[in-house]
Amino acid sequence: MVIRAVVFDIGGVLEITPDLGLDRRWETRLGLPDGEILARMRDIWRGGSIGTITLDDVHEALRDRLGLDHQKVAQYMADLWREYLGTANTEPIEYARRLRPRYHTGIVSNSFVGAREREQAAY
């Protein structure tokens, strides 16, 4: 079989995405017990990862479920994107570049709603 294309994942492969403790910091800030943000937002995180909701839906849920005002939603989302986007993993990115034009290259991801635009801008 002849290999004609190579496909890469983004999170954890082309991006280094360590856990920066986003929810723990915000739970402390909001006076919530550990795990409470996930408990309240689980269906929203799922919907955002499979594309069944919009970024506006995420913002609305953060306001309604966590009691955040517009400014705090913006702060939370800025923290979320910092953690979610991580940093470029330059070694596999350079490897992917070297494969072209001999092979078709592609990226597959279950990126969260709104992430694609930020990933394209960052990388």
Residue ranges and their predicted role:
Residues V2-T90, P101, F112-E117:
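N-terminal helical cap/lid subdomain that shapes the substrate entry/recognition surface
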Residues P92-R97:
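Short amphipathic alpha-helical segments and helix-helix/interface helices
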Residues S109:
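Short beta-strand/turn micro-motifs composed of small residues
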Residues E119-Y123:
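Short, intrinsically disordered, charge-balanced linker/junction segments flanking boundaries
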